A protein has these predicted regions:
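Acidic, metal-coordinating helix/loop segments flanking the phosphotransfer/catalytic sites
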Residues: 20, 32-50
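Two-component/phosphorelay signaling modules centered on CheY-like receiver
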Residues: 12-31
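Basic, Lys/Arg-enriched C-terminal extension of HTH/homeodomain DNA-binding domains
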Residues: 182-218
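Regulatory hinge/linker segments at domain boundaries
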Residues: 129-155
Length: 218
């Protein structure tokens, strides 16, 4: 019986090596790469049985983009997202939900690599994967936020003023201030009138939520 072929896409070298070793020990054939460009070359050469994808890979396609493309071209491919992001919308606030056939694991919630392998086996065998969908956790601090609220939270974390946020989103200042206020209320953040406290509080929340804030590339 041939080994099942798994592609691992993870930009952190140590974690990529750890995952690769665990999968090989579990009997999988593994090819691991650190970027979307390298992954694309692998997928063009050979169809994998499964893919374990980090989501935030820097500029260019995300792991979500790759996973959706894989599932569109080969619905039988098992896809497991492995990420620090508690909510996939932080990469693209307007994106939809993760494909129901894919597992979504938060790196912060995994105690060992066996949980990752268990999730992979569950997807491969078309079993119930509800326990491997960390993005659907109702207790997630940002699960209640709308796409617009997620976007303003990211912009506030970058130190942008309310006026700058309004300009970037092409909204009025009053509408922007109201949205920011509703966002903070939803999160239970009491910021008072100190703008420095405001920024620090939001940045701390974003750090805890696993959100990666990047400067614009354009």
């Amino acid at each position: 019986m041939s080994k099942r072929f798994v592609v691992v896409v993870e930009d952190e070298p140590f974690l990529r090596s750890l995952i690769t070793n665990a999968l090989e020990t579990a009997g999988f054939e593994v090819a691991s790469v650190g970027s979307a460009a390298e992954a694309r070359k692998l997928f063009n050469k050979r169809d994998p049985d499964a893919a374990i994808l980090d989501i935030d890979l820097g500029p260019g396609p995300t792991g979500l983009d790759m996973g959706e493309r894989l599932l569109a071209l080969s619905p039988g491919t098992a896809v497991v997202y492995l990420t620090m992001l508690s909510d996939p919308r932080v990469i693209n606030p307007t994106s939809g939900l993760v494909n129901p056939r894919a597992a979504y694991l938060n790196k912060r919630k995994l105690s060992d690599t066996q949980e990752l392998i268990d999730a992979l086996e569950a997807v491969l065998h078309d079993q119930d994967i509800s326990e491997y969908r960390h993005d659907l956790d109702p207790n997630s601090p940002i699960a209640k936020l709308s796409a617009g609220q997620l976007q303003v939270l990211q912009l506030v974390s970058k130190g942008m003023t309310n006026q700058q946020i309004a300009d970037k989103r092409k909204r009025s200042l009053s509408a922007t201030e109201a949205l920011i206020s509703r966002t903070f209320t939803s999160l239970g953040i009491d910021l008072g009138r100190d703008s420095n406290t405001r920024i620090l509080a939001v940045k701390e929340f974003i750090r805890q939520a696993g959100i990666v804030v990047r400067d614009d590339q354009d």
